[in-house]
Curated annotation (Swiss-Prot):
Biological processes, Gene Ontology terms: protein folding
The entry's keywords: Chaperone, Cytoplasm, Stress response
Record gene name: grpE
GO CC aspect terms: cytoplasm
Entry annotated with the keyword Disulfide bond: no
Compartment(s) where it occurs, according to its Swiss-Prot or TrEMBL record: Cytoplasm
Predominant location: cytoplasm
Protein family membership: Belongs to the GrpE family.
Domain of life: Bacteria
Complexes and interactors: Homodimer.
Sequence segments annotated as region (Disordered): 1-35
Record's protein name: Protein GrpE
Lineage: Bacteria, Bacillati, Bacillota, Bacilli, Lactobacillales
Amino acid sequence: MAQDIKNEEVEEVQEEEVVKTAEETTPEKSELDLANERADEFENKYLRAHAEMQNIQRRANEERQNLQRYRSQDLAKAILPSLDNLERALAVEGLTDDVKKGLGMVQESLIHALKEEGIEEIAADGEFDHNYHMAIQTLPADDEHPVDTIAQVFQKGYKLHDRILRPAMVVVYN
């Protein structure tokens, strides 16, 4: 019987030690789990911040490229009326050949400078395209002139790469 009491006491002590060790390891595991969760949270925040910085840099680069690509837009819009006036001056009757030649040279140099900056004249012959042309008048269509074709150009249109600076003002068969 004394032996049984001793065995029971030993078992109780062992059980208490097991319970104590389990209680001691449980908080450690939960602290470790909390630390891992916080580490994961910080890693996610870091990855998001890193991705956001990359997006900001990409957008800034795109914006810089667009500014560079379209830098001459305002200047071109200011020069186009002068180019139109030169064209009208060349169409006037009674100018001497020397004056026409001089005006033609100025016109050519302006057109060349605009082309170097990526500014092109919009083609205004054939089919009417509302993206590039502005119909300011219509004429009745017939057998020779199908519907939605351009009859006459009142003012040339220009584009800078893929941007329309000014649509071509045209007369359209309707």
